[in-house]
């Protein structure tokens, strides 16, 4: 381990931030966490952009809906489409805001156990 960069400690953020201003949140992550900026979540923009909504929006082949504050599998809903659309929009805006940045970058997404625990099954 003679490579000094291999011993360097990095830190980053978890993802969720208050507010609804995506541009300001991204700028803050680049400013405050320059070693490993991250794609922020802004759950105040709606449930489809929080940790669970974002993760479910990335699933392919599984339909979900949000009903009375609970995500449910098996039914295609507008919130699932919103989650996917917001993800695409966030990544596009991130690309614009990160022009010229060439370092490491963190994107965190809820894993399968978190999504399973936060999702119910629609009863038909």
Segment roles from a protein language model:
Residues 1-123:
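Alpha/beta catalytic barrel-like cores
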């Amino acid at each position: 381990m003679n490579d000094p960069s291999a011993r360097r400690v990095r830190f980053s953020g978890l993802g969720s931030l208050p507010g609804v201003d995506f541009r300001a949140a991204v700028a803050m992550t680049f400013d405050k966490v320059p070693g490993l900026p991250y794609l922020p979540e802004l759950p105040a923009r709606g449930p489809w952009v929080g940790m669970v909504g974002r993760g479910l929006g990335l699933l392919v082949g599984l339909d979900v809906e949000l009903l009375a504050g609970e995500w449910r599998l098996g039914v295609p809903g507008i919130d699932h489409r919103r989650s996917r659309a917001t993800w695409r929009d966030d990544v596009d805006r991130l690309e614009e805001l990160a022009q010229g940045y060439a370092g490491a970058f963190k994107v965190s997404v809820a894993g399968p156990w978190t999504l399973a625990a936060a999702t119910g099954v629609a009863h038909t």
